Amino acid sequence: MQGSVTEFLRPRLVDIEQISSTRAKVTLEPLERGFGHTLGNALRRILLSSMPGCAVTEVEIDGVLHEYSSIEGVQEDVLEILLNLKGLAIKLEGKDEALLTLTKSGTGPVLAGDITHDGDVEIINPEHVIRNLTGQADISMRIRVAKGRGYVPASTRIQSDDEERPIGRLLVDAAFSPVSRIAYNVESARVEQRTNLDKLVIDMETNGTLDPEEAIRRAATILAEQLDAFVDLRDVTEPEQKEEKPEFDPILLRPVDDLELTVRSANCLKAEAIHYIGDLVQRTEVELLKTPNLGKKSLTEIKDVLASRGLSLGMRLENWPPASIADE
């Protein structure tokens, strides 16, 4: 059904094609013309830069003092080993960092599955090769992993107190993002008679720690939260001014002359020092009848005039008179 020309179509998640354990295609449609590239580029940048993940941040290898060392009986040098450790796909549950250990002897490849860890750590790619032992060598290392996002070079994590860091504790450039590659394509879509719509196809490759649908959801949430500032732009730049409620109804501050009473009634009230309507409404019928020359006819007139303004005799006004009147 054709909606209003001012209404925007709302896209829906149409399909998730799982190409491999680490690659998937996500399709969303229909999108208004041009929105495919607008949203596709925004989501792509967020998926590459802002997805949370886990990465190796520090490594200690027994017998190694710096990253330019080589280890007897190991095919790779230390720099290559550190690069291989960056390829670990790890998930942490219930903690922000963990210390893993890896100890092995003999010959053959040392795999990610050989790492010792507790139940809060899951290694997604246990077949990932960390190093190859070519001789009867014993290897022992400690690997610190942490949660984060984006890419954090080791140089930015060096602090002033790092001079006390033990020699041999190697800092590693941390690539936290679980998304290794992402591309998007905009195709044509159709809804009823409209043929100029967009279909957004996002081709995503991860390290296996993040589900593609969850990745899209997180990226969209981040984008929406950032755009909230533009939706509430007026509230941010111009704080709402709270109106101060007056202490008394303005009509109570007006003189009794505004009631346009008869001359007789007006003179009787002034003789009793009743100058404002607020003074008058606090008097009772009994009190007014005690006023010289003010009879029942004048009392009825006063009651009718007050009633026409939503007022009556015998009202209680706290803190009367206000300072503006009391000072006069």
Curated annotation (Swiss-Prot):
Pfam families: RNA_pol_A_bac, RNA_pol_A_CTD, RNA_pol_L
Transferase is among the record's keywords: yes
SMART domains: RPOLD
Enzyme Commission designation: 2.7.7.6
UniProt keyword terms in alphabetical order: DNA-directed RNA polymerase, Nucleotidyltransferase, Transcription, Transferase
Chain positions covered by the region annotation Alpha N-terminal domain (alpha-NTD): 1-234
InterPro entries recorded: DNA-dir_RNA_pol_insert, DNA-dir_RNA_pol_RpoA/D/Rpb3, DNA-dir_RpoA, RBP11-like, RNAP_asu_C, RNApol_insert_sf
Molecular-function GO terms, alphabetical: DNA binding; DNA-directed RNA polymerase activity; protein dimerization activity
A single BP term in Gene Ontology: DNA-templated transcription
Subunit note: Homodimer. The RNAP catalytic core consists of 2 alpha, 1 beta, 1 beta' and 1 omega subunit. When a sigma factor is associated with the core the holoenzyme is formed, which can initiate transcription.
Protein's UniProt name: DNA-directed RNA polymerase subunit alpha
